[in-house]
Amino acid sequence: MHKFLPIAYFEDKFVPFEDAKISVATHALHYGTAAFGGLRGIPDPEDPGTILLFRLDRHGDRLSKSAKFLHYDISAEKIKEVIVDFVKKNQPDKSFYIRPLVYSSGLGIAPRLHNLEKDFLVYGLEMGDYLAADGVSCRISSWYRQEDRSFPLRGKISAAYITSALAKTEAVESGFDEAILMNSQGKVCEATGMNVFMVRNGQIVTPGNEQDILEGITRDSILTIAADLGIPTCQRPIDKSELMIADEVFLSGTAAKITPVKRIENFTLGGDRPITEKLRSVLTAVTENREPKYQDWVFKIPLNG
């Protein structure tokens, strides 16, 4: 059972979470005309009175750009300002997740984006590990990732996640933890809410942006960290069979962080994951503000400031 943070931002004001309610006729509820983001926050291990948010600037910028697909102009600065105030009002004392959402708040039944009211909301919940930290099993989904020519995949659009929901439930009902989706060319694309990486012969490989993936912020962070560590990286198409015989496979995302993959279909991957574990160790240190080189990725919010 989720434990939601007590205060939400809704209709331009902060209200008790229980009071943030929409009409049954809300356009986004019927047509998926919404876009969302997701950030993790933790109390600073060295100063519990300070909250650390990972890559707030990038998350604000991505949601602002996603909103443009909905014909909604909201600045990244506005998004960041509200999120900072949201954290201060909630005074979290455990690891938590923030969900900002822009959506068509007008009432109606015609699929459109013009002449339609929009709104911006934020809520949050306590969150530990989203997926099992010791690794997950993955099914290759029978559902395919959408194509950018028919869906704005550069935005984090809510409607796109019906495919993720279908793939996730299919995987769980088949006895797996997670699903990996192919794109329309039959190449590895992403998991249900995470980017996919593999390691072969000491090189990190991940599908490039042209493979219809979400341009993940954690993904980008991992590629930067790997390069700084001197680990070779490559962005290119990945075949399904190649993934199954990889030395290491892991998933990345704001909620999932870095999660190892133990098994794909009936192919068990090796238990030694030196590169995955090294990246996970460094990324954890970065999010806890213990890596001076990446301190500009961590936004500090003093709760009593």
From Swiss-Prot:
Gene Ontology molecular function terms on file: L-isoleucine-2-oxoglutarate transaminase activity; L-leucine-2-oxoglutarate transaminase activity; L-valine-2-oxoglutarate transaminase activity
Domain of life: Bacteria
Record-linked InterPro entries: Aminotrans_IV, Aminotrans_IV_CS, Aminotransferase-like, B_amino_transI, BCAT-like_C, BCAT-like_N, BCAT_family, Class-IV_PLP-Dep_Aminotrnsfr
GO biological process, one term: L-leucine biosynthetic process
Pfam family name, one: Aminotran_4
Names of required cofactors: pyridoxal 5'-phosphate
Record-listed N6-(pyridoxal phosphate)lysine modification sites: 156
Record-listed E.C. numbers: 2.6.1.42
Annotated metabolic or biological route of this protein: Amino-acid biosynthesis; L-isoleucine biosynthesis; L-isoleucine from 2-oxobutanoate: step 4/4; Amino-acid biosynthesis; L-leucine biosynthesis; L-leucine from 3-methyl-2-oxobutanoate: step 4/4; Amino-acid biosynthesis; L-valine biosynthesis; L-valine from pyruvate: step 4/4
Keyword Lipoprotein: no
Keywords: Amino-acid biosynthesis, Aminotransferase, Branched-chain amino acid biosynthesis, Pyridoxal phosphate, Transferase
Reaction(s) the record says it catalyses: L-leucine + 2-oxoglutarate = 4-methyl-2-oxopentanoate + L-glutamate; L-isoleucine + 2-oxoglutarate = (S)-3-methyl-2-oxopentanoate + L-glutamate; L-valine + 2-oxoglutarate = 3-methyl-2-oxobutanoate + L-glutamate
Role, per record: Acts on leucine, isoleucine and valine.
Family of this protein: Belongs to the class-IV pyridoxal-phosphate-dependent aminotransferase family.
Stated name of the protein: Probable branched-chain-amino-acid aminotransferase
Gene source species: Synechocystis sp. (strain ATCC 27184 / PCC 6803 / Kazusa)
